[in-house]
Amino acid sequence: MYDYIKGQLTKITAKYIVVEANGLGYMINVANPYSFTDSVNQLVTIYLHQVIREDAHLLFGFHTEDEKDVFLKLISVSGIGPTTALAIVAVDDNEGLVNAIDNSDIKYLMKFPKIGKKTAQQMVLDLAGKFVEAPQETGHTKARSNKAGNTQLDEAIEALLALGYKATELKKIRAFFEGTSETAEQYIKSALKLLMKG
């Protein structure tokens, strides 16, 4: 098992980042790959969780140990896999998540991709009271100069699809942001807020 990796961030895609350490490039699945844009070609520390399957060994990465802790609690719930847990972490609203779990707000929990009523109820059963203190949002969004709007929006939509959101939902998101000029990371964060509002 790995706790963290320290190395050079060499690549960002819609689904994962690549960190090079000791001559090896590690593919690491992350909640919002574009939140790492400012760190390309720089030394980074990524907190890790490894999932071993028959057909693959997967690494999931996080900005902070708090983010990793939320992820680990989520995948302990029956019906929630790593991809769904990443989609929940990507919303970056841990306080809202904890409040929803502790107050049995099933409707809020069902707004996450692939979370139906039964899984939402299971989240409440398994996790209520488990978050002693709601971790703060990671706050890793930084203001940057805007790049070409459409390309950035395309990348954001691709990343949201990778998190499990439906194309029909994202068609409305694309229409909402058409004509604006933001970074992919900013589009993702804004889109996730809109998706959670329903």
Swiss-Prot record:
GO terms for molecular function: ATP binding; four-way junction DNA binding; four-way junction helicase activity. The keyword Flavoprotein does not apply. Residues 148-198 are annotated as: Domain III. Keywords: Cytoplasm, DNA damage, DNA recombination, DNA repair, DNA-binding. Residues 64-142 are annotated as: Domain II. It comes from the Bacteria. One of its GO terms (cellular component) is Holliday junction resolvase complex. Pfam families: HHH_5, RuvA_C, RuvA_N. GO terms for biological process: DNA recombination; DNA repair. Signal peptide: none annotated. It is found in: Cytoplasm. CDD domains: UBA_RuvA_C (cd14332). Residues 1-63 are annotated as: Domain I. Its main location: cytoplasm. InterPro entries: DNA_helicase_Holl-junc_RuvA_I, Hlx-hairpin-Hlx_DNA-bd_motif, NA-bd_OB-fold, RuvA, RuvA_2-like, RuvA_C, RuvA_C_sf. Residues 143-147 are annotated as: Flexible linker. The RuvA-RuvB-RuvC complex processes Holliday junction (HJ) DNA during genetic recombination and DNA repair, while the RuvA-RuvB complex plays an important role in the rescue of blocked DNA replication forks via replication fork reversal (RFR). RuvA specifically binds to HJ cruciform DNA, conferring on it an open structure. The RuvB hexamer acts as an ATP-dependent pump, pulling dsDNA into and through the RuvAB complex. HJ branch migration allows RuvC to scan DNA until it finds its consensus sequence, where it cleaves and resolves the cruciform DNA. Belongs to the RuvA family. Homotetramer. Forms an RuvA(8)-RuvB(12)-Holliday junction (HJ) complex. HJ DNA is sandwiched between 2 RuvA tetramers; dsDNA enters through RuvA and exits via RuvB. An RuvB hexamer assembles on each DNA strand where it exits the tetramer. Each RuvB hexamer is contacted by two RuvA subunits (via domain III) on 2 adjacent RuvB subunits; this complex drives branch migration. In the full resolvosome a probable DNA-RuvA(4)-RuvB(12)-RuvC(2) complex forms which resolves the HJ. Has three domains with a flexible linker between the domains II and III and assumes an 'L' shape. Domain III is highly mobile and contacts RuvB. This is Holliday junction branch migration complex subunit RuvA. It comes from Streptococcus pyogenes serotype M5 (strain Manfredo). The gene is ruvA.
